[in-house]
Regions:
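Short internal beta-strands
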Residues: 53-60, 237-242, 388-392, 412-423
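Nucleotide phosphate-binding/pyrophosphate-handling subdomain across enzymes
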Residues: 16-32, 40, 47-51, 195, ...
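Hydrophobic Val/Ile/Leu positions in short beta-strands of Rossmann-like dinucleotide-binding domains
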Residues: 33, 133-135, 470
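Short glycine-dipeptide loop
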Residues: 232-238, 383-384, 464-465
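N-terminal leader/targeting and accessory segments in enzymes
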Residues: 1-120, 245, 270-276, 310
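Beta-strand->loop->alpha-helix junctions that form or flank phosphate-binding loops
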Residues: 58-60, 77-80, 115-122, 160-163, ...
Length: 494
């Protein structure tokens, strides 16, 4: 086992588990997903349907995702009920499904095979070479970029990512299979299960403490990423960002353990340097220069890269994708052309509409660093005009840990409205409310107990050229349409 594993720590499950062999997709038989409508679960279900596996599933309520799965051939029930567990061989759950779930209880009683979501995804990977993208931020966009690049370069990869890719209308696709094929996966670190994929290329965009409701301490987060890198196939390559302190430390530990590492960033010390970054509306450009050795091969060159998405962070994400393409055998100019083919990912600075020159964007950011980057991009696109934000904190534990950091990030807007916390899987924590953020001393950041009032206020203040953003991992995304409606009512009455 790699030197990366030599830390004397007792970690929460499943981090203490050995790296398991992948199950065969065919041996799973008829598969039922408990919570099939989630981003990760729906992607795996889509892959299995395309592979001809009988799929059923359940969720708490009807959604567009569930309807799409039905149209693809899945049998989906709402709500969840023990009676749904029949004529199946394997049940797939995520960490969000607790032991008191009626369907899981029924599956246990029937002695059915129960797999974690990550085990099911590993089975779907089959014999493909895996590119697994992890990181506290940017993994959905970066994995989507890599999938699009490899596809446009003719590799016909399979992919499973955490967002719908523009131009593909899906978060998953079954491409070429078998030896020599590629599978691009977003590797979610939130519960430590990302050690199951055994990638040939592991991309780590950044490493910061997050998901402390699971990990409890920052040290456990860092150890989980150690395990992720150690889980690579023999001869695997770590691609990571030298600009990020946590990722840089991971790269140094990996190199000390004899693992191949290629770094990227704006730093002159990075193996691939990103420079001359400029933005033009919703597009951006940069110059990439690289010189490194990997697997006994020398890589060196310079290439201009144009993206159809804005922001410094996206140019860094693109650098990771570009290196991946080089390692897969692509020519630099072809890789750059393929990068321009990436049209964005859903809820990643996604334009929801434009009324009288006022643009409304939506973003999934839910960590202070992500919020800062989203607002930084918004500021660039606003180009001197005002930036208004409606932010919904995600999880009580995250709000408690990062309240002051959220406030500082949100102060980058001209005015930010903070809604009540979206609890997701958590119960309330005494004393933890959105007012921890709004009370941190930034005059631009305001508490909004009434979303309707915040929307009305923004619609009255915004003028042509301004940018409005809805930000968060909860249901704040639905407010974009309401904001557009208010803007229509104000500007387009006639």
């Amino acid at each position: 086992m790699s030197e990366l594993m030599n830390l004397n720590m007792v970690l929460p499950e499943p981090l203490n588990l050995p790296f398991p062999a992948r199950a065969s997709l065919q041996e799973l038989g008829r598969v039922h997903f408990v919570g099939i409508g989630g981003a990760g679960m729906s992607a795996i279900a889509t892959l299995m349907l395309k592979a001809g596996i009988p799929v059923s599933g359940s969720d708490r309520a009807e959604t567009a995702t569930i309807q799409a799965l039905r149209e693809a051939g899945a049998r989906v029930y709402t709500p969840q009920d023990a009676a749904n567990i029949h004529d199946i061989d394997t049940v797939v759950i995520s960490t969000a499904i607790h032991e008191d779930n009626p369907e899981l209880i029924a599956a246990r009683a029937q002695n059915l095979r129960v797999l974690h979501r990550s085990e099911a995804l590993a089975a779907a990977m089959g014999a493909s070479q895996v590119v697994a993208v992890a990181g506290t931020h940017g993994k959905s966009t970066t994995s989507s970029m890599i999938a699009v690049m490899l596809d446009k370069l003719g590799f016909h990869p399979s992919f499973a990512v955490g967002t719908v890719i523009a131009g593909y209308g899906s978060n998953a696709r079954l491409g070429a299979t078998g030896e020599g094929s590629w599978f691009v996966a977003e590797a979610d670190e939130s519960d430590g299960s990302f050690v199951r994929y055994q990638p040939a290329i592991a991309v780590v965009t950044n490493v910061e403490p997050d998901h402390l409701d699971f990990y409890e301490t920052p040290e456990r987060v860092y150890e989980a990423f150690n395990r992720f890198v150690a889980s690579m196939t023999p001869g695997g390559v770590l691609v990571t960002c030298w600009d990020d302190e946590g990722a840089r430390a991971l790269a140094e530990r990996a190199r000390d353990a004899g693992i191949e590492v290629v770094t990227y960033g704006q730093s002159t010390e990075a193996d691939l340097r990103v420079s001359r970054i400029t933005s033009h509306g919703s597009e951006s450009s940069a110059t990439l220069r690289w010189s490194f050795e990997c697997a006994s091969k020398h890589y060196e060159g310079e290439q201009d890269a144009q993206l159809r998405v804005p922001g410094i962070h996206n140019q860094l994400n693109a650098a990771a994708a570009f290196i991946t393409a080089l390692l897969a055998g692509a020519q630099p100019e072809d890789a750059a052309a393929a990068l321009y083919g990436f049209g964005g990912a859903d809820r990643r600075f996604t334009l929801r509409g434009d009324v009288a020159g006022i643009k409304v964007f939506d973003d999934y950011a839910h960590h202070p660093t992500e919020v800062f980057r989203a607002l930084e991009t918004g500021r660039t696109v606003a180009d001197g005009h005002n930036l208004y934000v409606v932010f919904q904190p995600h999880l009580f534990s995250r709000t408690q840990e990062f309240a002051a950091d959220f406030a500082q990030a949100l102060s980058k807007a001209d005015r930010s409205y903070v809604l009540d916390i979206y609890p997701a899987r958590e119960l309330p924590i005494e004393g933890v409310t959105s007012e921890l953020i709004t009370g941190a001393g930034f005059s631009e950041v305001h508490y909004a107990s009434d979303a309707a009032a915040a929307i009305e206020d923004i619609a009255m203040c915004a003028v042509p050229g301004d940018i409005i953003m809805t930000i968060g991992a909860g249901d704040v995304t639905a407010l974009g349409e309401r904001i557009l409606h208010e803007l229509h009512a104000r500007y387009l009455k006639e």
